[in-house]
């Protein structure tokens, strides 16, 4: 059977969404929204969307046949059957108001993802950190095993050149978003929880117990014959395990993990470890990603694959050949500067735990390099809520260039901006950070800061990623152009 025939067979098994033909995405340039839109385009739906700025996601969707408008306007939704929105979109958005007036159904991103998953074998990956990498690793293992899954990932899977793809099998592998509790819409066959920390607490009324209970509810969306794959190394996950009334498979470095990593070592970008599973021979593996946190992500993929009886050879090959994900400890190259060669790495992590894991991976893989971090805080509320944690973790680098907060649409909060954070780090006494008032000014500072052999790490979830790529394309020539607008 050809791939086209297999896809046709799959389509015949999955009911279409009744009369829905034309689907419009408000904020289509986001990775999650754009990924779902790409799958729907390839399923044959007429997809349109809008965002405040053009980016790689909108460009790709245009090439696939989606109709993209830059800017939000009521006329964009005049001829559509349903409007899909993310929580980043203000309810006063003109397209939302127009859809309400026209009585067009408005659904959240996770509701549309749930529809895609409804008639498939869903694998949903949740957790405060590591979702994108874990989802990418699972998709890669399943692809290596010939399972040809559909996947929707929150970052660019480098080997596929996209963050979403429509496969020909019954499998759908996707990130599950806890930031707005919308992951409760999903009803997968397998759920993964990587870890649980206090983040997006405005969604949960500042109540950490409510957040933990919501993760338990997410796992209880599994059928009674489904499988919950959880990281036993995480203290909060371990705490809620007695409340989970589903089959559990645990993973981690802990001795009581069902899927356990042993003999960990790291050299440069690669990690080596042995995985021990109940009833199976030990497996020696090479992971083409740095850091113990990524070994945990790989263990989740191994646990899911083992439960689905995927051959160890596919696991082994997928991990050693893994090409990474965009903006997840992404090596952008080595560049000559007047003072010597500098290595440039870009990372999306924007929570203190994520930043700490990135620093640890950099220290382990390149212990002789001076670590220079250009960090852009993301959201005033996160900076306020985790302020002391940020002060502590950012003090661990050798040189810190601290940009102002990327607001992501939030109003400024006094005492939770880049200048305040810079002062607090300086008062701690471990290093003297340099405040960068505008991303454009970073290039002006770098020549005086960088030394031969440095590892320059650009870190954060805002437009610092665009700046990092601009530095790479100019070989750290520091000819910085205008950065993209903050996307909706």
UniProtKB/Swiss-Prot annotation:
Name of protein: UDP-N-acetylmuramate--L-alanine ligase
Recorded name of the encoding gene: murC
Entries under InterPro entries matching the protein: Mur-like_cat_sf (IPR036565), Mur_ligase_C (IPR004101), Mur_ligase_C_dom_sf (IPR036615), Mur_ligase_cen (IPR013221), Mur_ligase_N (IPR000713), MurCDEF_pg_biosynth (IPR050061), UDP-N-AcMur_Ala_ligase_MurC (IPR005758)
Species per Swiss-Prot/TrEMBL record: Shewanella baltica (strain OS155 / ATCC BAA-1091)
Family note: Belongs to the MurCDEF family.
GO annotation (BP), single: cell division
Primary localization: cytoplasm
Enzyme class of the recorded protein, top EC level: ligase
Subcellular location: Cytoplasm
């Amino acid at each position: 059977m050809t791939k086209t025939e297999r896809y046709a067979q799959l389509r015949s098994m999955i009911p279409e969404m009744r009369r829905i033909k034309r689907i419009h995405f408000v904020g289509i340039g986001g990775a999650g929204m754009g990924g779902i839109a790409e799958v729907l385009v390839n399923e044959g739906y007429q997809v349109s969307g809008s965002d405040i700025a053009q980016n790689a996601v909108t460009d790709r969707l245009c090439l696939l046949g989606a109709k993209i408008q830059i800017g939000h306007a009521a006329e964009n939704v005049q001829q559509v059957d349903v409007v899909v929105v993310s929580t980043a979109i203000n309810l006063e958005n003109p397209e939302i108001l127009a859809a309400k007036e026209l009585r067009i159904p408005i659904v959240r991103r996770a509701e549309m993802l749930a529809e895609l998953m409804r008639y498939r074998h869903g694998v949903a990956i949740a957790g405060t950190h590591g979702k994108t990498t874990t989802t990418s690793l699972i998709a890669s293992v399943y692809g290596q095993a010939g399972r040809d899954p559909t996947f929707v990932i929150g970052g660019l899977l480098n080997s596929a050149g996209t963050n979403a793809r429509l496969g020909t099998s019954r499998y759908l592998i996707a990130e599950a978003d806890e930031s707005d509790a919308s992951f409760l819409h999903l009803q997968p066959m397998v759920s993964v929880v990587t870890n649980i920390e206090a983040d997006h607490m405005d969604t949960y009324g500042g109540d950490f117990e409510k957040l933990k209970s919501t993760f338990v509810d997410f796992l209880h969306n599994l059928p009674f014959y489904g499988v919950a794959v959880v990281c036993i190394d995480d203290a909060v996950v371990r705490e809620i395990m007695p409340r989970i009334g589903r089959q559990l498979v645990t993973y981690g470095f802990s001795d009581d993990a069902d899927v356990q990593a042993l003999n960990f070592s790291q050299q440069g970008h690669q990690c080596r470890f042995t995985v021990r599973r109940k009833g199976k021979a030990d497996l020696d593996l090479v992971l083409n990603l740095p850091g113990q946190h990524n070994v945990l992500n790989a263990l989740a993929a191994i646990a899911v694959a083992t439960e689905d009886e995927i051959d160890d050879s596919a696991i082994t090959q997928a991990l050693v050949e893994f090409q990474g994900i965009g903006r997840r400890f992404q090596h952008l190259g080595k560049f000559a500067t007047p003072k010597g060669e500098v290595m440039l790495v870009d990372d999306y992590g924007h929570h203190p735990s994520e930043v700490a894991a990135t620093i640890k991976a950099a220290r382990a893989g390149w212990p002789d390099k001076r670590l220079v971090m250009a960090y852009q805080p993301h959201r005033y509320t996160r900076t306020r809520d985790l302020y002391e944690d940020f002060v502590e973790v950012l003090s661990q680098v050798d040189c810190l260039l601290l940009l102002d907060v990327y607001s992501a649409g939030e109003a400024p909060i006094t005492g939770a901006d880049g200048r305040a954070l810079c002062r607090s780090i300086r008062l701690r006494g471990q290093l003297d950070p340099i405040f960068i008032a505008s991303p454009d000014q970073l290039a002006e500072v770098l020549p005086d800061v960088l030394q031969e052999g440095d590892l320059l790490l650009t870190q954060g979830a805002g437009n610092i990623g665009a700046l990092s790529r601009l530095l790479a394309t100019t070989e750290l020539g520091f000819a910085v152009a205008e950065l993209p607008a903050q996307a909706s």
